[in-house]
Regions:
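Acidic, mature catalytic/reactive cores of soluble proteins
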Residues: 1-570
Length: 570
């Protein structure tokens, strides 16, 4: 072997490639400090590194290879057997190319949005991939992940398509309307699957299923309890409401050039109204004028949205655990300016839809969700203003959800006082656990019982900004709660972004919170500037937990850096 395996010009070539890399990221990112530019570049490069080739032909997996032993017959009895036409043969952005080397449906949507500023073409391709004919089931369901293709995941595909379009339009001067039209066609099919499959009782309650939050419930929310009771998940209905508004926003954009999309926009207004009624009123009336429910997910006593346990005899109870499951309703919000409302008549709820809605839904709350104007905008919100203030008092309370590095997934009040609920012969307990999972549910390698998760925080930040755009300075909240520091919802969103970006920034002590007590990573000159993007973060001190290379959805922090710079709030 030669003494010098590389040619003399190797260093020059390597430095040239390094310079080109820096120039490319400089062209994508706003002007940032050296510290923040490192975070941005590390997040983006990790996102690129987690793209892997993935091949899985389900029919071959079921039937086996010629001239080889047949696979276990049990495969034919699994839910995955329904997906026999799934044919994966693509480069896919993995959640973590080491620990999670496979596609995950809702993770991939966050990856797409994170890709949008640095590679719009990849962002669009990844956001559409799982909705292509090679992946979707005959009933239009989108696959979840390889071990349980049929699991329902949070339906954020419309949000991802909308944000990818908007980011490219902002950064490049024009949005890709053909992409948005193609996305809409596929999303409409998936929307039909959600509406027809999960609303089993006909009362707009979406219950059962994974829904992305793993072990967040006091019971495993995927299954009925042993006595036949079922859990009506407030976040399931809220995710569906968010999907309705995302599709409404897409339809409104497309209707500017193709007026036929106005009919779709009207449909989503109706659907959103029904979903808002489900979470917020004491009774839901279906199309046959039959009262389906005598309760709501909003608990006026506590000022929070809770899951409801519904028994076979018709009785019910709240599962009074304060988790981000009860914060998901905050994500279903949109507002439109005067010109847009004049162009798309169905957005003018007061003059067009109020008679229809008043007959089919409870008229006394319509004005709380529709038709209100402020800052020359009209608001569509699953959470009315009176509920919003009460929920945010919990969100921004440092004894509840607000941590030094973002919003926790479970209230800290359950650290010393765990929540326990007994139902028949089953007893469930939920305790605040800020780091690793305390239970084996879902394998025990993720934990939604206290840690800070970047994807939910990002969605919450965007929702606060939507509320802030509508309310302006007419709605202020204490940040933190009981601090006497009253700020607008827009400013509150930026304060959250600072806390989340702070996970990766060096503090005054020279330490990065995500590295925790690992002195090698904190201080060694060879390691201290090599950033990892963990799956989730300790709910008290911000140290990284879970998969350590999950640059996928944690890379969304680069969008936060962009916003903080754009609004001069570094």
């Amino acid at each position: 072997m030669p003494v010098a395996p590389f040619a003399a010009e190797f260093d020059q070539v390597f430095k040239a490639r390094e310079r080109e890399c820096l120039e490319y990221y400089h062209s994508c990112a706003p002007p940032l400090s050296l510290e923040d530019a490192l975070i941005y570049r590390s997040a983006a490069s990790g996102l690129l590194w987690c793209k892997k080739f993935y091949r899985w032909v389900v029919i071959r997996w079921l039937s086996g290879d010629p001239n080889h032993p047949a696979p276990p017959v049990e495969r034919l009895k699994t839910d995955n057997a329904y997906w026999r036409r799934l044919y994966a043969d693509d480069v896919i952005s993995m959640p973590d190319s080491w620990e999670y080397p496979y596609f995950c449906q809702w993770d991939l949507m966050f990856h797409s949005v994170a890709f949008a500023p640095i590679d719009p073409a990849t962002a669009k391709a990844q956001s559409m991939l799982l909705r292509s004919p090679r992946y979707t089931a005959p009933n239009a369901q989108t696959p979840a992940y390889e071990w349980a293709l049929s699991d329902p995941n949070p339906p954020i595909g419309a949000w991802a398509a909308l944000r990818v379009f908007q980011i490219e339009r902002h950064d490049r001067g024009s949005g890709d309307l053909p992409y948005l039209r193609a996305a809409m066609r596929k999303l409409i099919l998936e929307y039909g699957w959600w509406a027809n499959r999960n609303d089993r009782s006909g009362d707009n309650v979406f219950e059962g299923g994974f829904l992305g939050l793993d072990n967040i419930g006091v019971f495993d929310r995927r299954y009925p309890l042993s006595d036949g009771s079922v859990i009506e998940q407030c976040d399931g209905t809220a995710w569906m409401a968010m999907l309705s508004l995302n599709l409404l926003e897409i339809a409104v954009i497309l209707s500017a050039e193709e007026p036929e999309y106005k009919d779709l926009a009207e449909r989503f207004v109706y659907d959103f109204a029904q979903l808002a009624s489900t979470l917020n009123t004491d009774a839901v009336i279906n199309e046959t004028a039959k009262v389906m429910r005598s309760y709501r997910n909003w608990d006026e006593q506590d000022g929070f949205y809770y899951d409801v346990i519904k028994r076979q005899d018709g009785s019910w109870d709240y599962l009074r655990s304060r988790s981000i499951s009860g914060l998901i309703p905050l994500l279903a919000v949109a507002s439109f300016d005067v010109d847009t409302v004049q162009r798309v008549e169905s957005l003018d709820v007061n003059s067009i839809l109020r008679p229809y809605l008043a007959e089919r839904i409870c008229p006394n709350w319509i004005s709380q969700h529709f038709g209100r104007w402020n800052n020359d905008r009209t608001l569509f919100s699953l959470v009315p203003e009176s509920h919003l203030r009460r929920i945010l008092e919990y969100v921004f309370d440092e004894d509840e959800f607000l941590s030094p590095n973002g919003v926790r997934s479970l209230s800290k009040v359950y650290e010393e006082n765990p929540y326990t609920f007994c139902e028949g012969e089953e007893t469930g307990t939920l305790a605040y656990s800020p780091a690793d999972s305390p239970v084996a549910m879902f394998g025990g390698n993720s934990n939604w019982r206290g840690p800070v998760w970047m994807p939910f925080n990002f969605l919450l930040i965007e929702s606060l900004q939507k509320f802030g755009r509508y309310y302006g300075d007419t709605f202020k909240i204490e940040f933190p709660t009981r601090s006497g520091n009253w700020i607008s919802l827009w400013d509150a969103s930026l304060e959250l972004e600072k806390r989340l970006v702070g996970l990766f920034r060096r503090g005054e002590d020279g330490r990065r919170p995500f590295n925790g007590a690992v002195e090698l990573f904190q201080n060694d000159p060879h390691w201290k500037d090599l950033l990892l993007f963990n799956e989730y973060f300790h709910g008290d001190n911000g140290s990284g937990v879970g998969a350590s290379h999950q640059t996928g959805w944690t890379a969304i922090v680069l969008k936060m850096l962009t916003q903080l710079q754009r609004y001069n709030s570094m």
